[in-house]
């Protein structure tokens, strides 16, 4: 028996490791533009407002792609859809490295916007895909930690790739970032096909592990069970309306929008803030981004562990999820303190504190695994992500305007800090009890 228990614990961690690597790459590719932004804007003559719009191109497409992406996942399963996703987003990233061959600034701006838009479209199934795979491979009591791990890949990406990209810009040129990061992704897309299967179709899974996952509430077919395609197709607007009229779900959605305002500040304007406002070199900025990212990473893992531990200690799911979220968001507001300090060290310290908090409170995906109606996990994840990433449209553009009208980042940081407060209030006052949402079926 000891042998089976020892070996029934392996395969799902390999799957999780793969998701983690791909998600790191996903965020690395999102961040390429922010690291290249300072030299690029100088070389190509792009102003703050325009750059804000180019930064937002990714999120426009990412948001538009959420619902169709969720639908594709529910129809074809994560393995195939995700492969196409990785391959395409990497290809478009490589092409961005050639955008400067179009001569005139106007043409370059259009090409940049279009290519970033395509990267966003291609990346849109990634997180709902992660969610589908984790729901398939992990029993409920391990899901918070599993979701926290793939979620924290976003910070890990910065820890690894930001110094590397800063170095590339300093040593080679800004185009090289896109070629190398994109090339890496194309290679990884084929590795993905070798590694990822659903639990029922996995070539080397131990039956004991499969039973363990199944008994613990894992949805082991991973959207590949052909018999329930009949039920799956009929997603109506009435269903979406039901999801949006739930006070609990709406609170979770709005909070996610606010939490992501911090994420998108970090993914777009943060390196520019360090270079232009705080006068660091690009290389320094690449390394300076590591500390906040590392803190976000640690916070993210801790938040998931604390939350799952509270559930094991028989606290309610509501308490176990909300406590880390509310504490974390409270810490996030410290981003505003950066306006009142001058030394590089102090700035990095308060940014790091804010990101530790944001990571610790980023349990949105775990909460979604707890509340999404069984019939519509892909779609609920898509809606959740739609709200979350609308922040990626709003934040870069608004901050672009704030910088261009006030000439500094002060109000930008206040704008971001206020969002942490709103998210906190959503969980405190609006969400209520966290439980699985029951669809009222139109049939009966």
Predicted feature locations:
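Central cavity-lining transmembrane alpha-helices of secondary-active solute carriers
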Residues: 56-71, 290-303
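C-terminal ends and interior cores of transmembrane alpha-helices
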Residues: 87-105, 330-342
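Cytoplasmic helix-loop-helix junction between adjacent transmembrane helices
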Residues: 115-155
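C-terminal transmembrane helical hairpin of 12-TM major facilitator-type secondary transporters
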Residues: 318-364
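Hydrophobic core of transmembrane alpha-helices in multi-pass small-molecule transporters
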Residues: 92, 107-124, 345-359
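Extracytoplasmic gate region of multi-pass secondary transporters
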Residues: 33-37, 241-301, 361, 365, ...
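Juxtamembrane intracellular "pre-TM" segments in multi-pass secondary transporters
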Residues: 2-8, 201-251, 277
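Helix-loop-helix hairpin linking two adjacent transmembrane segments in secondary transporters
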Residues: 150-203
């Amino acid at each position: 028996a000891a042998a089976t228990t020892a070996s029934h614990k392996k395969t799902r961690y390999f799957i999780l490791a793969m998701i983690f690597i791909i998600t790191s790459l996903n965020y690395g590719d999102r961040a390429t533009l922010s690291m290249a932004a300072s030299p690029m804007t100088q070389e190509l003559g792009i102003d703050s407002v325009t750059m804000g719009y180019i930064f937002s191109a990714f999120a426009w497409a990412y948001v538009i792609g959420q619902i169709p992406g969720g639908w594709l996942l529910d129809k074809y399963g994560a393995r195939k859809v995700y492969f196409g996703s990785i391959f395409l987003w990497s290809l478009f990233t490589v092409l961005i490295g050639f955008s400067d061959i179009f001569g005139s600034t106007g043409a370059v701006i259009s090409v940049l916007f279009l290519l970033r838009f395509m990267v966003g479209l291609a990346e849109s199934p990634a997180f709902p895909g992660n969610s589908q795979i984790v729901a398939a491979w992990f029993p409920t009591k391990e899901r918070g930690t599993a979701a926290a791990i793939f979620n924290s890949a976003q910070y890990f990406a910065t820890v690894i790739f930001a110094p590397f990209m800063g170095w590339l810009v300093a040593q080679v040129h800004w185009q090289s970032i896109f070629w190398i990061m994109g090339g890496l992704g194309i290679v990884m897309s084929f590795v993905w096909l070798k590694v990822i299967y659903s639990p029922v179709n996995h070539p080397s899974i131990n039956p004991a592990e499969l039973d363990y996952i199944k008994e613990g509430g894992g949805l082991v077919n991973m959207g590949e069970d052909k018999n329930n395609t009949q039920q799956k197709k009929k997603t109506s607007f009435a269903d979406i309306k039901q999801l949006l009229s739930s006070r609990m779900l709406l609170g979770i959605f709005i909070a996610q929008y606010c939490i992501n305002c911090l994420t998108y500040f970090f993914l777009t304007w943060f390196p520019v803030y360090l270079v232009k406002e705080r006068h660091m070199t690009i290389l320094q900025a690449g390394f300076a981004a590591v500390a906040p990212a590392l803190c976000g990473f640690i916070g993210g893992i801790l938040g998931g562990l604390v939350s799952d531990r509270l559930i094991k200690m028989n606290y309610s799911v509501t308490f176990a999820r909300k406590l880390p979220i509310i504490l974390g968001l409270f810490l996030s507001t410290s981003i505003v303190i950066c306006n009142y300090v001058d030394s590089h060290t102090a700035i990095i310290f308060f940014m790091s504190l804010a990101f530790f908090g944001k990571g610790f409170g980023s349990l949105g995906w775990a909460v979604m695994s707890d509340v999404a109606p069984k019939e519509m996990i892909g779609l609920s994840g898509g809606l959740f992500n739609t709200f979350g990433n609308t922040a990626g449209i709003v934040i870069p553009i608004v901050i672009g305007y704030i910088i261009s009208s006030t000439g500094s980042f002060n109000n930008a940081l206040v704008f971001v800090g206020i969002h942490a407060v709103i998210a906190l209030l959503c969980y405190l006052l609006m969400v209520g009890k966290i439980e699985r949402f029951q669809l009222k079926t139109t049939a009966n």
